[in-house]
UniProtKB/Swiss-Prot annotation:
It is found in: Mitochondrion membrane. The keyword Metal-binding does not apply. GO terms for biological process: mitochondrial cytochrome c oxidase assembly; mitochondrial respirasome assembly; regulation of proton transport. It is a multi-pass membrane protein. Residues 1-79 form the HIG1 domain. The chain crosses the membrane at residues 15-32, 45-67. The gene is RCF1. Disulfide bonds: none annotated. One of its GO terms (cellular component) is mitochondrial inner membrane. InterPro entries: Hypoxia_induced_domain (IPR007667), RCF1 (IPR050355). Residues 126-150 are annotated as: Disordered. Belongs to the RCF1 family. Residues 71-150 form a coiled coil. It comes from Meyerozyma guilliermondii (strain ATCC 6260 / CBS 566 / DSM 6381 / JCM 1539 / NBRC 10279 / NRRL Y-324) (Yeast). This is Respiratory supercomplex factor 1, mitochondrial.
Amino acid sequence: MDIIQKMVFKSKQQPLVPIGALATTGAIILASKSIRRGDRIKTQIYFRYRIGFQLLTLVALVAGGLYYQTETAQQKQTREEKLRDKAKLREKLWIEELERRDAVIQERKKRLEESKAELLEVAQQGFEEARETETREAQLKKEEIEEKEN
């Protein structure tokens, strides 16, 4: 809220205060004009008006402050409901974020398990091929030895 919006908002909340301020300003302007003209009686009257308008403005300001200081039960309930709704929304967003993170973690675990299984399979194939090669080599050596003996 910028300053103009804030002034308009406060003026709508307490409409007697700006009216009293304008009336006080008007009384001061009229008093200054009567001073220039040299009319002492009118000057005194306008200054008395100024004091009266200032008093009314001050009373309106204090009364409005007291009125708006004590929230009505409905306003308080509405404010609390807004805060509750905001908290629920935050909680919902947080839960969604946690679920998203959990899904990412589960996907990573799944890929890791698949990768491990694939590596184990490749390693098993390599071991089997190595055994077969060793078995063939052993058979070839055995055959060579048998041929030499014959």
